[in-house]
A protein has these predicted regions:
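Start-transfer (signal-anchor) and selected internal transmembrane alpha helices
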Residues: 1-18
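Membrane-interfacial loop-to-transmembrane alpha-helix junctions, especially the N-terminal start
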Residues: 6-9, 97-105, 148
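Extracytoplasmic loop-helix module adjacent to an early transmembrane segment
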Residues: 17-57, 69-70
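Short hydrophobic/aromatic helix or loop-helix immediately within or flanking a transmembrane segment
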Residues: 54-85
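Membrane-water interface at transmembrane helix exits
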Residues: 69, 73, 95, 99, ...
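Alpha-helical transmembrane segments of polytopic membrane proteins
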Residues: 77-87, 126-134
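Transmembrane-helix motifs of polytopic, lipid-linked glycan transferases
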Residues: 84-103, 139
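Membrane-interface micro-motifs in multi-pass membrane enzymes
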Residues: 102-145
Length: 148
């Protein structure tokens, strides 16, 4: 029981550190798609419904991702909260997938994938395009096989 609490505390701390790393990097150098989506938000007068309708008729395959990117580009603090949750969910299955070293995946993600890797498109679009889907995938696999 104590080991389990320590593991959850560990992945929570790693999740917070990772989200803060992205947030700080984003504040220092907002680049790429993120700045473009801030302009889209102004263009649509921060009306997410109009943006969604426009994207649906122009590029519907990216509607969900671009809507999330627009929302998080405007509301960065919400992005930090959701990215902590997404990173936590990304690391949660590591206890089941690598029982001997459950802390290793979190450590490797934090060390091997630094925030500077995501500077071309911006922190928020990259997180929405890659970390969120990976989190959902591992979350679904974890709960699919958790009873086994």
């Amino acid at each position: 029981m104590k080991n389990s609490k320590r593991f959850y505390l560990y992945i929570f701390i790693v999740s917070v550190l990772y989200a803060i790393q992205y947030y700080i990097n984003n504040k220092i150098t907002p680049v790429g798609d993120q700045t473009a989506f801030l302009k889209y938000a102004e263009e649509f007068q921060y009306n997410y419904l109009y943006f969604g309708i426009d994207r649906y008729f122009t590029w519907s395959s990216r509607l969900l991702i671009e809507s999330a990117t627009l929302l998080f580009s405007v509301h960065e603090k919400l992005f930090v909260v959701v990215s902590v949750l997404a990173t936590f969910v990304l690391l949660l299955p590591s206890k089941k997938f690598s029982k001997e070293l459950p802390w290793l995946p979190g450590f490797l993600i934090f060390i091997c994938i630094p925030a500077s890797e995501f500077l071309s498109a911006g922190s928020i679009p990259t997180y929405v395009n890659y970390i969120f889907p990976a989190s959902f995938l591992l979350f679904s696999l974890y709960f699919r096989y958790s009873s086994n």
